[in-house]
Amino acid sequence: MGELPPQVQNLVAQLQQLQQQLQAVITQRAQVEALLRDTEQALEELQKVDDETPVYKAVGNILVKEKKEDVIKELTEKKETYEIRIKTLQRQEEKLRERFAETQQKLQNLLSPQAG
């Protein structure tokens, strides 16, 4: 068996690159989804607390007393940002999967005549 033709080598390299990009996007999405879950959980807990209960927010290594409504507003904004980021990452993931499938098909088409 000889060396693979340059076109095949190029497609294999493209597939590897797409696979790495896809894995990076999947990892990012999982991280942002975890942040979203944490934020939603914090918002749920804040809803249970009455307005007179002191609320503290972590700032670096210290806790700072904050107004409950300010913390809720900040967490709600973070939640919305995370949701937008997740949608963006999902679209990127979808496009990468499509490109991966197309490139894989091109590679199979190139290799199938050689298989016979």
From Swiss-Prot:
A family per Pfam: Prefoldin_2
Main location: cytoplasm
GO molecular function: protein folding chaperone; unfolded protein binding
Name of this chain's protein: Prefoldin subunit beta
Name of the gene: pfdB
Keyword tags: Chaperone, Cytoplasm
Entry GO CC: cytoplasm; prefoldin complex
Quaternary structure and partners: Heterohexamer of two alpha and four beta subunits.
Taxonomy, superkingdom: Archaea
Main function: Molecular chaperone capable of stabilizing a range of proteins. Seems to fulfill an ATP-independent, HSP70-like function in archaeal de novo protein folding.
Family the UniProt entry places it in: Belongs to the prefoldin subunit beta family.
Record-linked InterPro entries: PFD_beta-like (IPR002777), PfdB (IPR012713), Prefoldin (IPR009053)
Source organism: Archaeoglobus fulgidus (strain ATCC 49558 / DSM 4304 / JCM 9628 / NBRC 100126 / VC-16)
